[in-house]
């Protein structure tokens, strides 16, 4: 792994997501948690993903389901579209686009999600997410600056 964090923050991994993945620090914001979860997918860190999933959403098979996806998916990049956070609130939203390739697929694909996070006892947890509808003439959520119809419309997961 290069020294830069896989979350595309342009910060060194050791100063960005690594402390969260090692469990030495808690993510101070929902966006930081989102970035750390992306980095956990890149580095195949199922423990961090499970620990940061809201307890009400953890199923007995979650670890096996996560581990099964790791060898088949190569994560290529994360683009944060927006973050709606208020330090006094216990709920926050982060909209992002993540580029990946499934091993048996030919094309890059994009996961576009508006994730919801809840804060419990000063710890942020991922609870759920929805895939926003993107108009064909809207800017592509991958961050390319091109229209969605000319960019990733056919590669959305």
UniProtKB/Swiss-Prot annotation:
Gene3D superfamilies linked: 3.10.450.50
InterPro entries, per database record: NTF2-like_dom_sf, SEC_C_motif, UPF0225, YchJ-like_M
A Pfam family matched in the record: YchJ_M-like
Protein's recorded name: UPF0225 protein PMI1492
Native species: Proteus mirabilis (strain HI4320)
SUPFAM superfamilies: NTF2-like, Sec-C motif
UniProt family annotation: Belongs to the UPF0225 family.
């Amino acid at each position: 792994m290069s020294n830069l964090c896989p979350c595309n923050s342009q910060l060194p991994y050791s100063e960005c997501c690594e402390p969260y993945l090692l469990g030495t620090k808690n993510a101070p914001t929902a966006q930081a948690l989102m970035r750390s979860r992306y980095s956990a997918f890149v580095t195949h860190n199922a423990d961090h993903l499970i620990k940061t999933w809201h307890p009400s959403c953890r199923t007995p098979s979650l670890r096996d389901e996560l581990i099964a996806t790791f060898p088949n998916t190569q994560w290529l990049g994360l683009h944060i579209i927006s973050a709606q956070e208020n330090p006094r609130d216990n709920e926050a939203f982060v909209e992002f686009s993540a580029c990946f390739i499934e091993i048996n697929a030919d094309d890059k694909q994009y996961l576009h999600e508006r994730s919801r996070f809840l804060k419990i006892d000063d710890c942020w947890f991922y609870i759920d997410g929805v895939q926003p509808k993107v108009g064909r003439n809207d800017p592509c959520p991958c961050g390319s600056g091109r229209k969605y119809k000319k960019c990733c419309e056919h590669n959305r997961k």
